[in-house]
């Protein structure tokens, strides 16, 4: 199990997945490991999971989350790989959305599974960014992934896009980042925090 970052909408089901497949190993960044050991992280995951459950079902979670199953069990350093027989998955640290973001490259298929630092696709010609930590890091993460050897890119909350289309998607994501960075800078200079 490879986690891109520690937000509830990406790992909220991890407790149940680990209950069903207890021998599965959870891989993530060292910062994700640190984050998932914090009480405040658990409280946030529980709260947001209940908010989502309320929104979709009108009820809280049927069962409480077992935080002991929501942990990084194996730290994957930047550039490190995990072998699966003759195949390998490589981890790429891609911060910007959070400090713990990672993207993953499945070598045999030439597929790069992106973290939210690299932006999101909402539909045809509609992209957005969700930079919560650092615009410069997010832009570096986009460029790193954009120039990677991948033939296919899996965008978070969307799906797979081939390389021939991904370049224009990345371009609109960078433009969106720059617009948002300008807006945030202007608001900050006006005293808004």
Q: How does the language model describe each region?
A:
Residues 20, 147-148, 190:
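Alpha-helix C-cap/termination motif
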Residues 72, 80, 85-90, 100:
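Short beta-strand or tight-loop elements
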Residues 74, 133-137, 176:
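Soluble or luminal CAZymes and related metallo-dependent hydrolases
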Residues 183-193:
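C-terminal regulatory/interaction regions
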Residues 88-168:
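Metallo-beta-lactamase
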Residues 163-181:
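Short, electropositive alpha-helical surface patch
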Residues 31-33, 118-119, 178:
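Short, acidic/turn-prone active-site loops that include or flank metal/cofactor-
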Residues 1-74, 80-81:
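Active-site HxH/HxHxD metal-binding segment of metal-dependent hydrolases
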């Amino acid at each position: 199990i490879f986690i891109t970052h520690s937000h509830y909408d990406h790992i909220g089901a991890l407790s149940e997945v680990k209950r069903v497949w207890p021998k599965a190993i959870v891989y993530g960044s060292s910062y994700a490991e640190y984050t998932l050991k914090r009480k405040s992280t658990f409280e946030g995951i529980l709260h947001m999971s209940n908010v989502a459950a309320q929104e979709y079902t009108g009820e809280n979670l049927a069962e409480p989350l077992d935080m002991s199953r929501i942990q990084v069990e194996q730290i994957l350093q930047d550039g490190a790989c995990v072998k699966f027989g003759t195949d390998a998955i490589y981890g790429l640290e891609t911060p910007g959305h959070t400090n713990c973001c990672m993207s993953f490259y499945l070598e045999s298929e030439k597929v790069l599974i992106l973290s939210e630092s690299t932006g999101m696709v909402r539909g045809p010609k509609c992209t957005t960014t969700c930079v919560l930590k650092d615009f410069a890091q997010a832009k570096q993460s986009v460029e790193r992934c954009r120039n990677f050897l991948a033939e296919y890119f899996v965008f978070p909350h969307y799906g797979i896009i081939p390389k021939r289309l991904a370049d224009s998607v990345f371009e609109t994501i960078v433009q969106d980042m720059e617009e948002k960075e300008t807006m945030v800078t202007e608001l900050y200079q006006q005293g808004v925090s």
